[in-house]
């Protein structure tokens, strides 16, 4: 082998990233109190144990009806789907979702 072939090639130079500090500084200046609050925003109370139990039952029932394997991840997604449907006011013939919304 020729000695010039044995030399290692230098890695290509990386491009320097531009400084993003000004954008970060602007974001840090934003205060949540300055953001517009919607008049429909309401303060929610923490859910009761009965509401959590009912939500778990509804999520389990939903997963059984859709024949999805019951895993912690699928239970969480089913519970989030139920909560979002209730909060969005999606009509449902079941009285069970009204129980979550209004309490036991």
From Swiss-Prot:
Motif Nuclear export signal, residue range(s) on this chain: 49-58
Record's subcellular location: Cytoplasm; Nucleus, Nucleolus
Pfam hit, one: HERV-K_REC
Keywords, sorted A to Z: Cytoplasm, ERV, mRNA transport, Nucleus, RNA-binding, Transport, Transposable element
GO BP terms, alphabetized: mRNA transport
Primary site of residence: cytoplasm
Residue ranges annotated as motif Nuclear localization signal: 13-20
GO molecular-function terms, A-Z: RNA binding
Superkingdom of source: Eukaryota
Biased composition, class Basic residues, residue ranges: 10-20
Subunit structure: Forms homodimers, homotrimers, and homotetramers via a C-terminal domain. Associates with XPO1 and with ZNF145.
Full protein name: Endogenous retrovirus group K member 21 Rec protein
Organism: Homo sapiens (Human)
The gene coding this protein: ERVK-21
């Amino acid at each position: 082998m020729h000695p010039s072939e044995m030399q290692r090639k230098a890695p290509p130079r990386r491009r320097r990233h531009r400084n993003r500090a000004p954008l970060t500084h602007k974001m840090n200046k934003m205060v949540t109190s300055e953001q517009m609050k919607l008049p429909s925003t309401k303060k929610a109370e923490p859910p009761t144990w009965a509401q959590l139990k009912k939500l778990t039952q509804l999520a389990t029932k939903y997963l059984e009806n859709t024949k999805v394997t019951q895993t912690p991840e699928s239970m969480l997604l089913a519970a989030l789907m139920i909560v979002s449907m209730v909060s969005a006011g999606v009509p449902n013939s079941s009285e069970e979702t009204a129980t979550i919304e209004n309490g036991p």
